[in-house]
């Protein structure tokens, strides 16, 4: 399948991105540094990249940015201030909602930074600065390697804006390759998900957008109802859904959110739900543990999503659905 091939291409995407100088990164960093306001837009997976961009910009370089879903921006153009910067993210560069968001913001004298894979696209032409994902064609409808490529570009912008932010792309690429060498455990977990109706994915901080992206991958590839929830919101409603019929994926790397997220996992387990832990630390609370590499905190999102992409892929095979071309979906949504 194309989807599996594209998942396995991600170490190369990381390595290539680390080794090449991307045209426009410096210009993009300058534009962001001097911007009155920064907005980030995208649809689907690209919007989930925007959520991570917001967090890394504020955490590492103290720059505030506002993510807006592309399809929502057109109904609230008054939220956009004139002379701002819009970072528009789209793999195809032809997403109708993203192009409409760009059209609206351009009218307000906003500068556009286009993050795009297809360099012959409409979004490329509309960008004041264009950052190419450079990850090669992505055939599978569900975004995999393009998500990683988007995040790498956003990391490089943050690196350019900040001092002393070192990202070891080569080392990171190697650790992802190693993780991809042994997927037996993920394939076993996929068998367990075959008859499941509901999966919840829990994360805090920078891991929460990964919970949302994980839910999207599971929906797209397996047709299982999946929902990403912020860990701290568990007692504000989602805990009522926890029982012996559900699986919960806990995104829990060894960062500042670790202890609180583990506490949430224990509360969920006490209600009888099965727990899949995605972490670099094993815990007795997990019924199944997917080990991720120990790496710097900024890189956790990529190392967390890749095993979930695989889990969604293998679950699709178990359920006999087509992982490359999910029903009712198109690779590029060119109509509203």
PLM regions and their residue ranges:
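Glycine-rich phosphate-binding loops that contact phosphosugars or nucleotide phosphates
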Residues: 33-171, 204, 251-297, 311
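In a subset of proteins, long, contiguous C-terminal domains/tails are tracked
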Residues: 56-64, 222, 284, 299-336
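Conserved phosphate/anionic-ligand binding catalytic regions in large, soluble enzymes, centered on
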Residues: 3, 44-53, 208-220, 305, ...
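Active-site phosphate/pyrophosphate-binding segments
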Residues: 2-39, 129-247, 257, 319-336
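Active-site-adjacent beta-strand anchor residues
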Residues: 7, 251, 301
């Amino acid at each position: 399948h194309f989807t599996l091939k594209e998942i396995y291409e991600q170490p190369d995407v990381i390595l290539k991105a680390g080794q090449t100088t991307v045209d426009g990164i410096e210009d993009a960093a300058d534009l962001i540094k001097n911007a009155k306001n920064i907005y980030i837009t995208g649809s689907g997976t690209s919007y989930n990249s925007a959520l991570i961009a917001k967090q890394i910009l504020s955490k590492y370089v103290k720059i505030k940015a506002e993510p807006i879903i592309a399809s929502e921006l057109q109904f609230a153009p008054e939220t956009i201030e004139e002379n701002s910067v819009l970072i528009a993210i789209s793999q195809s560069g032809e997403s109708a909602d993203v192009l409409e968001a760009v059209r609206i913001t351009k009218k307000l004298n906003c500068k556009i930074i286009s993050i795009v894979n297809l360099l012959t696209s409409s979004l490329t032409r509309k960008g004041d600065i264009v950052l190419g994902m450079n990850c090669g064609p992505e055939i599978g409808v569900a975004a995999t390697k393009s998500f990683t490529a988007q995040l790498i570009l956003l990391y490089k912008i943050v690196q350019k804006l900040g001092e002393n932010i070192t990202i070891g792309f080569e080392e990171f690429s190697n650790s992802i390759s190693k993780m991809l060498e042994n997927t037996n455990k993920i394939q076993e977990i996929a068998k367990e998900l075959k008859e499941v109706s509901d999966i919840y994915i829990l994360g805090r901080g920078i891991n929460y957008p990964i919970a949302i992206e994980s839910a999207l991958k599971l929906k797209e590839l397996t047709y299982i109802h999946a929902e990403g929830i912020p860990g701290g919101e568990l007692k504000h409603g989602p805990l009522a859904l926890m029982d012996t019929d559900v699986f919960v994926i806990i995104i829990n790397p060894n960062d500042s959110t670790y202890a609180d997220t583990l506490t949430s996992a224990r509360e969920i387990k006490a209600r009888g739900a099965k727990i899949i832990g995605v972490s670099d630390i094993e815990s007795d609370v997990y019924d199944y543990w997917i080990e991720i590499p120990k790496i710097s905190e900024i890189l956790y999102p990529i190392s967390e999503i890749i095993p979930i992409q695989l889990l969604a892929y293998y679950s699709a095979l178990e359920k006999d659905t087509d992982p490359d071309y999910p029903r009712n979906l198109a690779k590029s949504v060119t109509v509203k």
